Amino acid sequence: MATVKVTLIKSVSGRIPNHKLCVKGLGLRRIGHTVEVQDTPENRGMINKAYYMLRVEG
């Protein structure tokens, strides 16, 4: 299955709680942290909710 590289580029401090949970669900812990996640509808939904804090490649 295809993968997507996701990087946290903005802080989760002061954000909507559901968006914080989406970032945590993607496995991101700190600013600049990059993870590779599978390109599934579930992960795409989390990325779409918190898009303004993330950089997505691939």
Swiss-Prot record:
> Which family does the UniProt entry place this protein in?
Belongs to the universal ribosomal protein uL30 family.
Q: Superkingdom of the source?
A: Bacteria
Q: Which GO terms describe its biological process?
A: translation
What is the originating organism of this protein?
Pseudomonas putida (strain W619)
What this protein is called in its record is Large ribosomal subunit protein uL30
Is Ribonucleoprotein among this UniProt entry's keywords?
yes
Q: Name any one Pfam family assigned in the record.
A: Ribosomal_L30
Give a yes or no for keyword Ribosomal protein in this entry.
yes
Q: Which GO terms describe its cellular component?
A: cytosolic large ribosomal subunit
Which molecular-function annotations from GO does this UniProt entry contain?
structural constituent of ribosome
Q: How is the subunit organization of this protein annotated in UniProt?
A: Part of the 50S ribosomal subunit.
UniProt keywords (A-Z) are: Ribonucleoprotein, Ribosomal protein
InterPro entries tied to this protein: Ribo_uL30_ferredoxin-like_sf (IPR036919), Ribosomal_uL30_bac-type (IPR005996), Ribosomal_uL30_ferredoxin-like (IPR016082)
